[in-house]
Amino acid sequence: MTILADDGEIELSSWWVENDLSQPTIILLHGVTSSKFSPDILLPMGMFNKSGFNILAIDFRDHGESTCEDGFYTAGQDETDDVVAAISWLKDKGVKSSNIGLYGSSLGGLVALMTPAKSDDFGSIAVIDPPVDFKTLVREEMAYQGLPTFLWEPIYHYAGIFKGVNMLKDIPEEALAKGNLSL
């Protein structure tokens, strides 16, 4: 099935497993370069389903079977819009905000932690291994790849100028504070 985001410009490939709409619903959020087909999503999906939860698994934009804008991810900046669209879709089905939970792994965890900056229409967040300090994460990844870490600054500016992405906007601590949540 498909959920529309960004005024219908983005089609999010999704799986919906309905058990009982009066019970909690979990939105499963995958990691970078992954999809809803990932074991990091399929395993919890099976466990949540067996426990009677409703489940919505989405492919973020530029991932899996969803619309590919440019093949890049935006460190949660645009991916949070995908989650907001998924929440809206659930609410249109009659799911109460308090019954909606976000479960994210890696990038999905980061996106879950950043979602309160754009929506508070959900009741809980559970994350596995989210990168919460993006600047440190990028520097460590650059060092791991054998690149000089001083290149962080030009990359940061490039992302802002050419992609319109502010990688330090709505970092998890700030996003959670907007939703009166703590890390």
Residue locations for each model-derived region?
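Serine-hydrolase catalytic core
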Residues: T2-D7, L12-W15, K163-L183
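Short beta-strand element of the alpha/beta-hydrolase
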Residues: Q23-G31
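The serine-hydrolase catalytic nucleophile loop
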Residues: V32-M47, F60
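Conserved alpha/beta-hydrolase
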Residues: M45-T67
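Alpha/beta-hydrolase active-site loop
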Residues: Y73-G94
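Alpha/beta-hydrolase fold nucleophile elbow
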Residues: G94-S105
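Gly/Ala-rich beta-loop-alpha elbow adjacent to hydrolase catalytic centers
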Residues: G104-G108, A112
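Hydrolase active-site cap/lid region
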Residues: M114-N166
